[in-house]
């Protein structure tokens, strides 16, 4: 099992940053390995990604979501992965975004790559591209302010 924790400061208000992060279908615009994300309902996503030259598809469940605080998920099938994204208000115009993620490595090369920091570099790069994406726009492309607890929409 490999784990990654990376953070970045985004020069936008917390609600703008959070709202943009909830636009999961926009992820391919800043996540290098992600080819497509389809939101099938309020708590389920279908992912397609290419990692290390290998194509992966899986379904994930949003297990927890609280506006301007956290989005957590877990894979329902395919290669195991889970994690959460935390949003912390620094001041009126800046937000700290932290990604915490765990995933199962497959084979010696993935395990070695993980151990050598390739996962951290990937997440750090994706966060940097997210920062550029939202800061250059100055506004979110949309937003979902609902709440999820234990995989169920509660609000």
Place the predicted regions along the sequence by residue:
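Hydrophobic ligand-binding cavity/cleft-lining segments
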Residues: 1-44, 129-138, 151-155
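Small-residue-enriched segments and motifs
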Residues: 32-34, 60, 85
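Short, hydrophobic/aromatic-rich segments at coil-to-beta transitions
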Residues: 39-46, 65-73
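Short, cysteine-centered beta-strand-loop-beta hairpins and adjacent loop/turn segments enriched
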Residues: 52-59, 105-108
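Beta-strand/loop substructures that line and gate deep hydrophobic ligand-binding cavities in soluble
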Residues: 63-64, 72-132, 136, 141-145, ...
